[in-house]
Amino acid sequence: MEFSRETRRLALQKMQERDLDLLIIGGGITGAGVALQAAASGLDTGLIEMQDFAQGTSSRSTKLVHGGLRYLKQFDVEVVSDTVSERAVVQQIAPHIPKPDPMLLPVYDEPGSTFSMFRLKVAMDLYDLLAGVSNTPAANKVLTKEEVLKREPDLKQEGLLGGGVYLDFRNNDARLVIENIKRANRDGALIASHVKAEDFLLDDDGKIIGVKARDLLSDQEIIIKAKLVINTTGPWSDEIRQFSHKGQPIHQMRPTKGVHLVVDRQKLPVSQPVYVDTGLNDGRMVFVLPREEKTYFGTTDTDYTGDLEHPQVTQEDVDYLLGVVNNRFPNANVTIDDIESSWAGLRPLLSGNSASDYNGGNSGKVSDDSFDHLVDTVKAYINHEDSREAVEKAIKQVETSTSEKELDPSAVSRGSSFDRDENGLFTLAGGKITDYRKMAEGALTGIIQILKEEFGKSFKLINSKTYPVSGGEINPANVDLEIEAYAQLGTLSGLSMDDARYLANLYGSNAPKVFALTRQLTAAEGLSLAETLSLHYAMDYEMALKPTDYFLRRTNHLLFMRDSLDALIDPVINEMAKHFEWSDQERVAQEDDLRRVIADNDLSALKGHQEG
């Protein structure tokens, strides 16, 4: 079904003519999951996103459907049980996206090690039990030092005790979002990107009856009426709630920044994903992951209070990650000049404050560490050894971390909360990508109940555990064979086997629709046939409106195919300009925007500063 710029125009028109059952603010994975289940359950559903879908946070993850093995060190069995159960569901409903990728976890004899060999074995066995893969080919393996080095010979040998291998899954985070969005659109949801909520419409009793929004492409104000409104904006959740709490700061969220860096595989060759302690005795672990012909590694985890739309990779972030990687892979000698791409994302962590947190628990008690840290900071301020800002930050940490075991952001729960304010606004916040379906299911259970009680409308929630996303109509037990069959179909449309296989993996059961475009398209100037098909499918069926949408989120060219990117920039912009009938001024603006994003991802400013 078409999902294009024209679809967007019609959706905005219809949203202004109706009284929706549910308006969703936010088009990341949380909002996309809610939209899919709401539309499939028959709710008259609308969704607005102020940027591109997944642009804010959901395209900036570690790109794993991660089981969370490290939580078992903290005995958070419920967290891991929920996570691996939901991971299995995502495999069922989006079988073309998560791919099994066994993870290697080396163990070192050093201060601050997350696991000893014994604890790792216990954790992996429990993990397998929770994931239902005990006594299967996917079950964990304990490795000797020699076996670890046979798999990854460039790992640091000093202090290496051995390791383990356990089942994990790589993910294409932005594709998971757009496939949920497309399915919601097919089921009748009205969806538009680049539309920003600016205020609420309120009735005489102060209850929300809609939203005042702005079309950021036309700068027109839009009035959207809805019986219920849900806020799924991740790190922006507090800002949206602020609309109806003028002058009263809301601190439900505690965003933390995570940075990943990308280098060529030859510079940092790893044959499989590696999850390893930093070696800095800071209680953290990092991933080193092969993708395409590149290797990426991360993440950092630091509190963030800056611009939510444009989190930046700093020199401190780079120094930290390069220090970790060069310590663990001593022969790599990775420098900032080797970094081909990068990304910085914000985790929408909950600050605590008695939120309903199925991933962590919430005692509501200030931890000793938090309290002691505040006392020490106040003493330092009195002695003129610290600043007022440091005291304010320490107070905020106590206010917003009542259930934390320690101050380290890595220890803050990734749990979710579902709340309703006095004005009727629902907010679904927190959580991890893996949990998105369960979060949406819980929220919609409550929303459907409210629609019946307050508006007399009855709906039956679909079984979202078996409801596939767009592209996901593939037998989960037979993914590789079905993808290969689609690829064979692509060769009949004139594609090479490699190109057909790439498109089949990217689009799943939508691949035949992509191949069918060959009936009306030939290779555009400067593009291969496969690139032309992918671009036009993104514009007409995935609401890609800007070159950055295509290069960064509909595909991963900007992250993991940097070698070929420069040659594609002009041909892609030319084709989009022709398709969308851009003026010369608009074409220049789009190119400037793309080159700014590329410069940010390439860390051009940091590299230039070093050279200067």
From Swiss-Prot:
Entry's localization field: Cytoplasm
GO CC term, one of those recorded: cytoplasm
Co-factor requirement: FAD
Residues engaged in binding FAD: 21-49
Source organism superkingdom: Bacteria
Keywords, sorted A to Z: Cytoplasm, FAD, Flavoprotein, Glycerol metabolism, Oxidoreductase
EC number: 1.1.3.21
GO annotation (BP), single: glycerol-3-phosphate catabolic process
GO molecular function, a single term: glycerol-3-phosphate oxidase activity
This protein's record includes keyword Chloroplast: no
Classification via PANTHER family: ANAEROBIC GLYCEROL-3-PHOSPHATE DEHYDROGENASE SUBUNIT A, GLYCEROL-3-PHOSPHATE DEHYDROGENASE
Family (UniProt): Belongs to the FAD-dependent glycerol-3-phosphate dehydrogenase family.
NCBIfam families: glycerol3P_ox_1 (NF033461)
Name of protein: Alpha-glycerophosphate oxidase
